[in-house]
UniProtKB/Swiss-Prot annotation:
CDD domains: GMPK. Keywords: ATP-binding, Cytoplasm, Kinase, Nucleotide-binding, Transferase. The keyword Nucleotide-binding applies. This is Guanylate kinase. One of its GO terms (molecular function) is guanylate kinase activity. Pfam families: Guanylate_kin (PF00625). It catalyses: GMP + ATP = GDP + ADP. It is an enzyme of class 2 (transferase). It comes from Pseudomonas fluorescens (strain ATCC BAA-477 / NRRL B-23932 / Pf-5). The gene is gmk. ATP binds at residues 13-20. Gene3D superfamilies: Guanylate Kinase phosphate binding domain (3.30.63.10), P-loop containing nucleotide triphosphate hydrolases (3.40.50.300).
Amino acid sequence: MTHSTGTLYIISAPSGAGKSSLVKALTDAKPEIRVSVSHTTRAMRPGEVDGVNYHFVSRETFVKMGEHGDFLERAEVFGNLYGTSQSHLQQTLDAGHDLILEIDWQGAEQVRKLMPQARSIFILPPSLQALHQRLTNRGQDSDEVIDGRMREAVSEMSHYVDYDYLIINDDFAHALGDLKAIFRANQLQQKRQQQRFGKLLAELLG
């Protein structure tokens, strides 16, 4: 059995929909799935670690990296810049690992144009009320910032139609099961299985 090239997964959601928690639970259960660590100019939040959650850089450094063509995609969200390293992404996929990009719809649009084979997943909250409550419970943002995120969420959620899969995060365990099912189904696609089991298939078919 040989390893197949990994699949790139784009996962997007409005802030507070539970995307990060679902991705962490998925990769805790399946450590062979990797998560791309984006570069950002936003301030580090309590509990975050540079190089783990994000590569935290200055706006000047980010702009220079962009000028050098280091980013596969980049976007500005709430006044902060975010970008995905092109070289690291390709190395991970070539090594046979499935790779998750946690990016917004703007970044997803850019990636799809460059890598149309990528699979995309959008996560929605069960209601606007639930979304507001989750943002409030995080205790990370002021009321003003939360109000801004809620306004932005309506615009963001309208882009779910551009994605391959849609998950409603009402019950966390159920949503996690849906996410795992998407990854498992894609691993069983004929082309990927052919790459993995080429020798076996040749023997079976004589």
